[in-house]
């Protein structure tokens, strides 16, 4: 097993984020940011009961040992974890960059944040389909979107638009070039009981769409 000098860093991270855990294990947040917490080869995220480990090492083999050591430690600290995924950022393999199962059988497919459900697909691409660092922005949208109309450009999987609808927006148009990403947004709508209007999901090139909107 890898040098475990980073274990105290994980212990401090768990203590610092104790208030973010929820009793039902449905939420999502960054559990350990190695870039600022002492181990730049490792980032650990939590999505409901699924642990997501990012191997940022220049040498993937070195980073894998650290990630596996972290996974072993965190499984002991968080016994309710039922799956773990590792993403290897510098791998030549697309499958390894997207992530593969390290332990468990089935990763979570949804998380709840500020009482809103969001669909996730943790191995769909190199990212994890849900940006944790826009948590506060989603809360702001929930609090400030009532009766507004929103255009969510480069929507990715649409979490900002979902938050706007949860906040009472009259209409949200979700745009992204990738239709697969928008399908994740549609699943989020279904999870929250929001109506899915085909015309509100636009898979198109940004410049083509922008020109069309300007001249309408």
Where does each model-flagged region fall?
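Phosphate-coordination loops involved in phosphoryl transfer and adenosine-cofactor binding
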Residues: 146-147, 169
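Conserved SAM-binding loop of SAM-dependent methyltransferases across substrates and taxa
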Residues: 157-170
